[in-house]
Amino acid sequence: MEPPGRRECPFPSWRFPGLLLAAMVLLLYSFSDACEEPPTFEAMELIGKPKPYYEIGERVDYKCKKGYFYIPPLATHTICDRNHTWLPVSDDACYRETCPYIRDPLNGQAVPANGTYEFGYQMHFICNEGYYLIGEEILYCELKGSVAIWSGKPPICEKVLCTPPPKIKNGKHTFSEVEVFEYLDAVTYSCDPAPGPDPFSLIGESTIYCGDNSVWSRAAPECKVVKCRFPVVENGKQISGFGKKFYYKATVMFECDKGFYLDGSDTIVCDSNSTWDPPVPKCLKVLPPSSTKPPALSHSVSTSSTTKSPASSASGPRPTYKPPVSNYPGYPKPEEGILDSLDVWVIAVIVIAIVVGVAVICVVPYRYLQRRKKKGTYLTDETHREVKFTSL
């Protein structure tokens, strides 16, 4: 009899795992007989929330994203097919919003980046030569709500104009009556007559022109007296640029007399600060070449450190030349013998060779005589006489 209060489970213990397995099989079958999430696109987005799976024949719809607009008749929907894939669809039906067309500015150009006016791209502006840009050089196509507009107003190209060039002391320029100069308009400067004996020199470029950004091409020149001293080179002479006076950019050339060499440049120019550039050269005396022949050495001269050389009969400082200690290359010195010119190890080799040769000459005959004695003589037991015989 079963104990009271205990009820029997209506399902045997083996049935619960079986039911769970059956449910998983049914769920797997339902998944395998469906489509996964629909594809995503750059220009379109799914209407509604996506599901983990879709049944066969189920349809999903798309709409154009912000910044894009729909152009029919291309489809913007797809259907889950029997082979568990989505029918082909693309976002070609959605086009980017474009900004309004911009004309080329007068005397300039508007260049769209990548050749398009679509939002997210840029428009670059450039002006023709002789004109400069007023405004933003780059505009951006942006979205304001659902409309694409440019980030600013298009710039304009203005003609390059320059104010009159500066006036200079002791000089003037052409077109001094003109108040406004256009691009590449040029003026030329010149110096006034000098009140003294030396004229004014024009330092700098005589002609300048109105350039980019309404700025003159160079700084204005100046007029002043430039006079260099007469160049004098001792032990030399002037070979070109002769004159009594040397003004701005005067050029002179020099050469030295025989027995002298030039220290410096042979050509000098009178600079704007009334000095020669480079400095006036010098002509220095050519020193005689030093003798390279070593003095003759006597065999009677001792090499001891205590031996003193004989005093020179000439007064003044003694020469610092030291005779070389090496032998003449190839042959011994005339005053040396053959043995003096040989190295110690060479002499040692010769001595050893002589000793070995003498030893060989002495030992060979001795050994020969010893062998002859052993073969040709013997002593008898009776008379102990020496008997000689000759073998046949």
From Swiss-Prot:
UniProt-recorded Gene Ontology molecular function terms: cadherin binding; signaling receptor activity; virus receptor activity
Protein's job: Acts as a cofactor for complement factor I, a serine protease which protects autologous cells against complement-mediated injury by cleaving C3b and C4b deposited on host tissue. May be involved in the fusion of the spermatozoa with the oocyte during fertilization. Also acts as a costimulatory factor for T-cells which induces the differentiation of CD4+ into T-regulatory 1 cells. T-regulatory 1 cells suppress immune responses by secreting interleukin-10, and therefore are thought to prevent autoimmunity.
Entries under Pfam families matching the protein: Sushi
Membrane topology value: Single-pass type I membrane protein
Disulfide feature: 35-80, 64-94, 99-141, 127-157, 162-210, 191-223, 228-270, 256-283
Subunit structure: Interacts with C3b. Interacts with C4b. Interacts with moesin/MSN.
Biased composition (Low complexity): 291-315
Source organism of this protein record: Homo sapiens (Human)
Alphabetical keyword list: Complement pathway, Cytoplasmic vesicle, Disease variant, Disulfide bond, Fertilization, Glycoprotein, Hemolytic uremic syndrome, Host cell receptor for virus entry, Host-virus interaction, Immunity, Innate immunity, Membrane, Phosphoprotein, Receptor, Repeat, Signal, Sushi, Transmembrane, Transmembrane helix
Membrane-spanning ranges: 344-366
UniProt-recorded name of the protein: Membrane cofactor protein
Result of altering residue 228 to Y: In a colorectal cancer sample; somatic mutation
